Amino acid sequence: VCVLAHHFGKEFTPQVQAAYQKVVAGVANALAHKYH
């Protein structure tokens, strides 16, 4: 997340961070579900 914030600068708003976290959580959930 810190790398993304540094890369995007002012474009990396709390809304963008929330969307990114939602995607990461979805991917992690899908992977966890796949392996169980």
Swiss-Prot record:
What UniProt keywords apply to this chain's record, in alphabetical order? Acetylation, Heme, Iron, Metal-binding, Oxygen transport, Transport
Record carries keyword Kinase: no
Which GO molecular function, any one, fits this protein according to its record? oxygen carrier activity
So which tissues is this one expressed in? Red blood cells.
Q: Where is the Globin domain?
A: 1-36
Against InterPro entries, the record matches this protein to: Globin, Globin-like_sf, Globin/Proto
> Which superkingdom heads the taxonomic lineage of this protein's source?
Eukaryota
In this UniProt entry, the residues modified to N6-acetyllysine are 34
Describe the subunit structure: Heterotetramer of two alpha chains and two beta chains.
| Family according to the record | Belongs to the globin family.
Role this protein plays: Involved in oxygen transport from the lung to the various peripheral tissues.
User: Can you name this protein?
Assistant: Hemoglobin subunit beta
Underlying gene: HBB
